[in-house]
Swiss-Prot record:
The active site is at residue 70. The gene is PER59. It is found in: Secreted. Pfam families: peroxidase (PF00141). It is an enzyme of class 1 (oxidoreductase). Ca(2+) 1 binds at residues 71, 74, 76, 78, 80. Its EC number is 1.11.1.7. Belongs to the peroxidase family. Classical plant (class III) peroxidase subfamily. It comes from Arabidopsis thaliana (Mouse-ear cress). The lineage of its organism: Eukaryota, Viridiplantae, Streptophyta, Embryophyta, Tracheophyta. Heme b binds at residue 193. Removal of H(2)O(2), oxidation of toxic reductants, biosynthesis and degradation of lignin, suberization, auxin catabolism, response to environmental stresses such as wounding, pathogen attack and oxidative stress. These functions might be dependent on each isozyme/isoform in each plant tissue. This is Peroxidase 59. The keyword Flavoprotein does not apply. There are 73 peroxidase genes in A.thaliana. It catalyses: 2 a phenolic donor + H2O2 = 2 a phenolic radical donor + 2 H2O.
Length: 328
């Protein structure tokens, strides 16, 4: 059957039937309509609050989708990342002084609790917020299957093992495979770096002594290298940020992949999808395909988000009233 799409509000909304054909199965206990009676205005409430947050700070869109990614890769999509405490995943190396948007989720949760107390999990709210961040930035939309429970424990050790911008491609692929995602998902989800910012701390290793012999990363385009060396000088402030996509910084599109073809990926983990030796037989052709076809990227990204949103560790959970702490 032909893929059907509807253009709505400047983004592509894939039909539910098409998504069912394209993407692997949704967890049996999840359904887009699970709150149809218990919280009928949920989707509108979340969308409104995300829109307010993005109006206040457009960068928040990328931050919210990153929260969802970092949550799902640890214990499954159970909002364990949102828990405070000494063993919080927020304190793991990939998240500390980096993960952001927790206050936005708190605000959304408060609005949802006001309308439907004790009904909607923080995990579902985070999943919806990630989707809305994409849509409100010009990306594709999809119906989110709901019914996740909030985890009872955080897992800081596992959070320390999240895919890293410093890792080689084979290690990154292995971490995706470990949570039942595939190479297409690796490339499609990396496309979320089409918006947002990154700190000098996570890419400055490419700028001056990448090889250990005093040379920068040879795959980095020369004019971008020169600019980044000015933004992130040796011994400078590692918390300064640079856009992941300089051309369309706040728009969700396929420009990220066009950048990779030109050596303009900001993170090492971005550029290796196209330039590394391993990429030749794994990810390079996908990068090229997505650079040519935004609709193909949107389709595969949507499917990858649905699959990632299905990650579960099978543990029991609850519906937290406060996303930062388990219920008494």
């Amino acid at each position: 059957m032909k893929t059907q799409t509807k253009v709505m509000g400047g983004h592509v909304l894939l039909t539910v039937f098409t998504l069912c054909m394209l993407c692997s199965g949704v967890r049996a206990q999840l359904s887009p309509d699970i709150y149809a009676k218990s919280c009928p205005n949920l989707v509108q409430i979340v969308r409104k609050q995300v829109a307010i947050a993005l109006k206040a700070e457009i960068r928040m869109a990328a931050s919210l989708i990153r929260l969802h990614f970092h949550d799902c890769f640890v214990n499954g999509c159970d909002a364990s990342l949102l828990l405070d405490g000494a063993d919080s995943e927020k304190l793991a190396i990939p998240n500390i002084n980096s993960a952001r948007g927790f206050e936005v989720i708190d605000t959304i949760k408060a609005a949802v609790e006001n309308a439907c107390p004790g009904v909607v999990s923080c995990a579902d709210i985070l999943t919806l917020a990630a989707r809305d961040s994409v849509v409100l930035s010009g990306g594709p939309g999809w119906r989110v299957a709901l019914g996740r429970k909030d985890g009872l424990v955080a897992n800081q050790n596992s959070a320390n093992n999240l895919p890293s911008p410093f890792e080689p491609l084979d290690a990154i692929i292995a971490k995706f495979v470990a949570v039942n995602l595939n190479i297409t998902d690796v490339v499609a989800l990396s496309g979320a770096h089409t918006f947002g910012q990154a700190k000098c701390a996570v890419f400055s290793n490419r700028l001056f002594n990448f090889t250990g012999l005093g040379n920068p990363d040879a795959t980095l385009e020369t004019s971008l290298l020169s600019n980044l060396q000015t933004v992130c000088p040796l011994g400078g402030n590692s918390n300064i940020t640079a856009p992941l996509d300089r051309s369309t910084t706040d728009t969700f599109d396929n420009n990220y992949f066009k950048n990779l073809l030109e050596g303009k990926g900001l993170l090492s983990s971005d550029q290796i999808l196209f330039s590394s030796d391993l990429a030749v037989n794994t990810t390079k052709k996908l990068v090229e395909a997505y650079s040519r076809s935004q609709s193909l990227f949107f389709r595969d990204f949507t499917c990858a988000m649905i699959r990632m949103g299905n990650i579960s560790n099978g543990a029991s959970g609850e519906v937290r009233t406060n996303c930062r702490v388990i219920n008494n």
